[in-house]
Regions:
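A contiguous strand-loop segment
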Residues: 27-150, 171-295
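Hydrophobic core
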Residues: 12, 16-20
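Bacterial N-terminal signal peptides that target proteins for export
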Residues: 1-11
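Sec/Tat signal peptide C-region and signal peptidase I cleavage site
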Residues: 21-26
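Residues at the start of alpha-helices and the adjacent loop-to-helix junctions
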Residues: 5-7, 18, 160
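Short, well-ordered beta-strand elements within core beta-sheets of diverse protein domains
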Residues: 155-161
Length: 295
């Protein structure tokens, strides 16, 4: 079992490494299992490839009890959440609203603007805000919810509330089921024992996958989850309607009788060339020099 320090360091290392990605209006997430690193470290993270400096970042500490039991958190776009206990302390990265105005929603109410990633006192780590886009036909059946949870609010809620990665997964998927999601997202949730990856591409459907140590993947704003067995409950947690929504939309790919779905093919709007390009780089097929990067 890897130590908390190694995992936490890995999260930051990935974020810093990916910062050399060429400028683009996009985001890129990366996971490297412990079997594929020299020192047995699990690595995951995400970079904001905006190509501009319009969203300055703050790395800060949210003190224990910053949110009180029973307090209602009012997010950027109408999502609300009632905290079940005094919040855990955590360190995180968020957008800078020291001017008093949120750079994301222009709101002046008390909320955390675009909290992207962090680690709480229980050793739970979250890397969120990797935007995903569902098929129009699937969204017609299960549309996004205007006041559902938005990707930038996930880190705030989970790090405040969850004492383990598994509890974080349970909390997030419960929110998807009940309040719904305002948009699609890919989210890493990890602790000293395991790392999970959660995707949603419509308002209420989702899949959470326990990530093996032998896998590397990158996610450039497209679904990274392919064919999965929904009966593999040790490693897969999915919404009860994961198959039926896709069937109603006419987008289902898989074997319904065997409870198997190709998640990407059924829900992802479209793939892009950034996926093979990134994997070719990680696999050593392509190499890059400093001259390949724009100033």
């Amino acid at each position: 079992m890897m130590s908390f320090k190694k995992i936490a360091a890995a999260v930051m290392a990935v974020a810093m490494t990916l910062a050399v990605v060429p400028s683009a209006f996009a985001c890129t997430a990366l996971y490297v299992g412990s079997d594929l690193t020299e020192d047995g470290t699990t690595m995951f993270g995400r970079i904001e490839d905006l190509g501009t400096n319009d969203y300055n970042k703050l790395f800060y500490v949210s003190a224990a009890g910053n949110h009180k039991a029973g307090e209602v958190y009012d997010g950027c776009y109408g999502f609300t959440y009632t905290f079940t206990h005094d919040s855990y302390s955590y360190t995180a990265r968020r957008d800078d609203n020291t001017s008093g105005v949120c750079p994301d929603c222009d709101g002046t109410h008390d909320h955390t603007p675009y909290e992207e990633a962090g680690t709480n006192e229980k050793g739970v780590m979250v890397s969120a805000t990797e935007s995903l886009y569902g098929k129009d036909a699937a969204l017609a059946v299960d549309p996004y919810v205007d006041d559902g949870i938005e990707e930038a609010e996930i880190t705030t809620v989970l790090l405040s509330e969850a004492g383990t990665a598994r509890k974080g997964v349970a909390l997030l998927t419960s929110i998807y089921e009940n309040a719904g999601a305002a948009g699609g997202a890919g989210v890493f949730i990890g602790d000293q024992n395991e790392t999970w990856f959660v995707e949603n591409l419509t308002g209420h459907t989702y899949v959470a996958l326990k990530l093996p140590d032998s896998v590397v993947f990158m996610q450039p704003n497209v679904s990274a989850i392919g064919k999965i067995d929904l009966d593999d409950t040790d490693n897969v947690i999915a919404s009860a309607d994961a198959i039926s929504v896709a069937q109603e939309a006419g987008t289902f790919v898989g074997d319904a009788a065997a409870n198997v779905i190709d998640w990407n093919a059924s829900y992802n709007n479209e793939d892009n060339a950034r996926t093979p390009a990134g994997l070719n780089y990680l696999n050593g097929v392509d190499t890059y020099t400093e001259d390949n990067y724009t100033e």
